[in-house]
UniProtKB/Swiss-Prot annotation:
Keyword Membrane attributed: yes
GO biological process, one term: apoptotic process
Its biological purpose: Promotes cell proliferation. Modulates apoptotic pathways. Increases mitogen-activated protein kinase activity. Important for cell migration, and for normal structure and assembly of the Golgi complex. Important for KDR/VEGFR2 signaling. Required for normal cardiovascular development. Required for normal angiogenesis, vasculogenesis and hematopoiesis during embryonic development. Promotes cell proliferation. Modulates apoptotic pathways. Increases mitogen-activated protein kinase activity and STK26 activity.
InterPro entries given in the database record: PDC10_dimerisation_sf, PDCD10, PDCD10_N
Membrane association type: Peripheral membrane protein
Family stated for the protein in its record: Belongs to the PDCD10 family.
Single GO MF annotation: protein kinase binding
Keywords tagged on the record: Angiogenesis, Apoptosis, Cell membrane, Cytoplasm, Golgi apparatus, Membrane
Gene: pdcd10
This protein's name: Programmed cell death protein 10
Pfam (any one): PDC10_C
Length: 212
């Protein structure tokens, strides 16, 4: 049975989503290791990237097994959200024009606010302010994306338009998750949705980096 285009896109998104721990958790480890042994760090990074590409989710499995073996009780989804705000070199747009650098800055700002959710969620007043800040950051990022669209022409505009639509879709999903949270109080679902939105933010940068 052949997959539809939509099913293929969903599978691709899910596959890349499970690879989030590679850059959110392991990349900072590799960066620290580079200060001690550059060659070993580069070899290890390349090995993890290759293994993750061939077996999506492998990094998460390895980290989870290590935590289990050490009997460390940790909310992995929450921890991932706290760590996901850092810049990932592979996703940063390198073009020097102000519009592209602003794209990096707006994406960074949104990710940083989202990563604070675990610290704010139990304080209703602070969390409501955080939600307002997230809404503003989403709008600012989309405005910046639209500004780049207006100023620059792309052969692969469809890929950019698709990624923008995906980002908007996950933004709305995040908003719906928040509404549900205020009814059922399940913070984990908010963390999951926030991680997905951070991932979509990175994919916007990656798409611009690829076609720009």
């Amino acid at each position: 049975m052949r997959m539809t285009m939509e099913e293929m896109k969903n599978e691709a998104e899910t596959t890349s989503m499970v690879s989030m721990p590679l850059y959110a958790v392991m990349y900072p480890v590799f960066n620290e290791l580079e200060r001690v042994n550059l060659s070993a760090a580069q070899t290890l990074r390349a090995a993890f990237i290759k293994a993750e590409k061939e077996n999506p989710g492998l990094t998460q499995d390895i980290i989870t097994k290590i935590l289990e073996k050490k009997s460390v009780e940790v909310n992995f989804t929450e921890s991932l959200l706290r760590m996901a705000a850092d810049d990932v070199e592979e996703y940063m747009v390198e073009r020097p024009e102000p519009e592209f650098q602003e794209l990096n800055e707006k994406a960074r700002a949104l990710k940083q606010i989202l990563s604070k959710i675990p610290d704010e969620i139990n304080d209703r007043v602070r969390f409501l302010q955080t939600i307002k800040d997230i809404a503003s950051a989403i709008k600012e990022l989309l405005d910046t994306v639209n500004n780049v669209f207006k100023k620059y022409q792309y052969q692969n505009r469809r890929a950019l338009e698709h990624q923008k639509k995906e980002f908007v879709k996950y933004s709305k999903s995040f908003s719906d998750t928040l509404k549900t949270y205020f009814k059922d109080g399940k913070a984990l679902n908010v963390f999951i949705s926030a991680n997905r939105l951070i991932h979509q933010t990175n994919l916007i940068l990656q798409t611009f980096k690829t076609v720009a």
